[in-house]
């Protein structure tokens, strides 16, 4: 039985903030994001930051003479690539974000999905190799960290009960963490939200609309994974999930005040 609970400061739920994409290669973008995070935390809303680091993983794999393959938007992870992927995500990407947090005056703690029994993990699909699927398990470690006013920075690396290191899609990792702490989920990407066939921002979507846009190829690949993760949380927790851009970090402050930014993924209305 998962030990999940609502962790909040006052009336504000934890903001589970997923970052990744090109952000990790943009010092100014990271600086602005951490400045916004510092203000949100100072205003009484805790943040858990979850990250991927696909661009860095691709670079490191190429440097080691390895190729990247994706299946339906998810990275195929053969055993021989695990040391490179774990090093890029749990190592370099995690500490790059932590360095930006420290520079912005945010006290943070670098961790992975494997820490303190917060998640259970298993292989998602043998076709994907060592790609993990995680379920919320125990929130007590995160509860302690947040009670100190610290910001967890969580890499999307998990470990199974068999001791296998697993690469978890960061959007799916953020989904599990939002469920674990009953938090509000914000998925940041390189674009401003979900765009229609003409490149215009769609302000709100539910499952039926997502299915239609997926069928005609407007939502595909990485955005498809992101939207499906958002729908999972929206429907299981009965609350909207935001998909927005890290390029407009100040919008997060507006979001913490209850305003809408990017695309809202809505629970299906019965």
Curated annotation (Swiss-Prot):
Family, per entry: Belongs to the acetylglutamate kinase family. ArgB subfamily.
Catalytic activity: N-acetyl-L-glutamate + ATP = N-acetyl-L-glutamyl 5-phosphate + ADP
One Pfam family named in its UniProt record: AA_kinase
The protein, known as: Acetylglutamate kinase
Task performed by this protein: Catalyzes the ATP-dependent phosphorylation of N-acetyl-L-glutamate.
Main localization category: cytoplasm
GO MF annotations in UniProt: acetylglutamate kinase activity; ATP binding
UniProt cross-references to NCBIfam families, sorted A to Z: argB
Pathway named in the protein's UniProt entry: Amino-acid biosynthesis; L-arginine biosynthesis; N(2)-acetyl-L-ornithine from L-glutamate: step 2/4
GO biological processes: arginine biosynthetic process via ornithine; L-arginine biosynthetic process
Gene Ontology cellular component terms for the protein in this record: cytoplasm
Primary gene name: argB
Source organism of this protein record: Shewanella halifaxensis (strain HAW-EB4)
Enzyme Commission code(s) on record: 2.7.2.8
């Amino acid at each position: 039985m998962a030990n999940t609970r609502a962790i909040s400061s006052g009336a504000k739920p934890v903001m589970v903030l997923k970052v990744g994409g090109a952000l990790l290669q943009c010092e100014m973008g990271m600086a602005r994001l951490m400045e916004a995070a510092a203000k949100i935390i100072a205003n009484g809303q805790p943040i858990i930051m979850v990250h991927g680091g696909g661009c860095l993983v691709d670079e490191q794999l190429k440097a080691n003479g390895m190729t990247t393959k994706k299946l339906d938007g998810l990275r195929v992870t053969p055993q021989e690539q695990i040391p490179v992927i774990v090093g890029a995500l749990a190592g370099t990407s995690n500490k790059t974000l932590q360095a930006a947090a420290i520079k912005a005056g945010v006290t943070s703690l670098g961790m992975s999905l494997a820490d303190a029994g917060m998640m259970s993990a298993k292989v998602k699909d043998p076709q994907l190799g060592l790609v993990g699927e995680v379920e919320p398990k125990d929130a007590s470690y995160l509860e302690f960290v947040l009670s100190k006013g610290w910001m967890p920075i969580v890499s999307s690396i998990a470990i199974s009960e068999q001791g296998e290191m697993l690469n978890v899609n960061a959007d799916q990792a953020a989904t599990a963490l939002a469920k674990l702490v009953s938090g509000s989920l914000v998925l940041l990407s390189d674009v401003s939200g979900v765009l229609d066939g003409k490149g215009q921002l769609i302000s709100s979507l539910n499952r039926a609309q997502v299915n239609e846009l997926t069928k005609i190829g407007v939502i595909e690949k990485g955005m498809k994974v992101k939207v499906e993760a958002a729908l999972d949380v929206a429907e299981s927790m009965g609350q909207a999930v935001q998909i927005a851009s890290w390029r407009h970090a100040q919008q997060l402050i507006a979001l913490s005040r209850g305003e809408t930014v990017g695309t809202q993924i809505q629970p299906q209305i019965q």
